[in-house]
A protein has these predicted regions:
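Conserved catalytic-core motifs of GNAT/GCN5-like acyltransferases
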Residues: 69-71, 83, 88-111
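Conserved GNAT acetyl-CoA-binding A-motif
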Residues: 60-74
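Conserved acetyl-CoA pyrophosphate-binding loop and the N-cap/start of the following alpha-helix
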Residues: 44, 48-56
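Acetyl-CoA-dependent GNAT
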Residues: 1-42, 54
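Short beta-strand-to-coil "C-cap" segments at the C-terminal boundary of structured domains/repeats
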Residues: 119-122
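Short acidic/polar active-site loop segments enriched in Thr and Asp
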Residues: 31, 66, 88
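Short hydrophobic/aromatic beta-strand or adjacent loop that forms the aromatic wall/cage
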Residues: 9-11, 112-117
């Protein structure tokens, strides 16, 4: 999946004496900037790096876009994180993970089936 958007997006790396977090964003049209991937190096998770990177995106793009959007699985780990970052649920794409991956995807013991989109005004 990553190869579908990596070359059309912009990658950002948060470097704090070494890489801590990265993300890729794409212009989805109609004023929507989408976070396609955000990941924090495991030893540095839950230390505010991903939230700081999201805030950097908000500041950088608030005059160019009207909405920052992210799609994720309905996981007890990711949904609350994005909600704490100011995102609200927008819509879902049924069966996204089962239709686009040749193997089951699990996060925190939850089998991911639908893609949940969350949005934050910029």
């Amino acid at each position: 999946m990553v190869d579908r958007y990596l070359y059309n997006g912009k990658m950002y790396v948060l470097d704090d004496d070494g890489m801590k977090c990265e993300c890729v964003v794409t212009d989805e049209g109609n004023g929507i900037l989408e976070i396609k991937n955000i990941a924090t190096v495991p030893p540095f998770q839950r230390k505010g790096y991903a939230k700081a990177l999201i805030e950097l995106l908000v500041e950088k793009y608030r005059r160019q876009f009207s909405i920052l959007q992210v799609g994720t699985g309905d996981s007890p780990l990711t949904i609350p994180f994005y909600e704490k970052c100011g995102f609200v649920r927008s819509h879902t794409v049924p069966n996204f993970f089962t239709d686009h991956y040749d193997h089951p995807i699990y996060e925190c013991g939850v089998h991911l089936v639908d893609m949940v989109y969350l949005q934050r005004p910029l």
